[in-house]
Amino acid sequence: SSDLTPTIKVKSSAKKKAQIIWNLKGNGVKYQVYYSTKKNKGYKKAATINSSKGKATVKKLKSKKKYYFKVRCSKTVKGHTYYSAYSKIKSIKIK
């Protein structure tokens, strides 16, 4: 549902790494973090993060290269998993 769609920020504070930070959406929500070197295709899932952590670090990226990130939420209710829309895509040049 739309109210589960996360808002994200991305920063590269260390070499070959990016940190993605998002707003928490409550208990039982998981966050899937995706990244790509192209804005509109080629996304890979970097991690699925449990509800209490509002951030993830993606490692082993290429220095001086631009990457794109997006996050979506999932919540399982009575055995059925619901997915949010993806966050707005954010890009960053890796240190």
PLM regions and their residue ranges:
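Pro/Thr/Ser/Gly-rich low-complexity, intrinsically disordered linker/stalk tracts
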Residues: 2-27, 63, 80-95
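Residue-level detection of beta-strand scaffold positions
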Residues: 22, 45-46, 66
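Extracellular low-complexity, O-glycosylation-prone stalks/linkers
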Residues: 27-47
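Short, solvent-exposed loop/turn segments that connect beta-strands within catalytic domains
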Residues: 40-42, 78-82
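Short S/T/G- and acidic-enriched coil/turn segments that sit immediately N-terminal to beta-strands
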Residues: 52-57
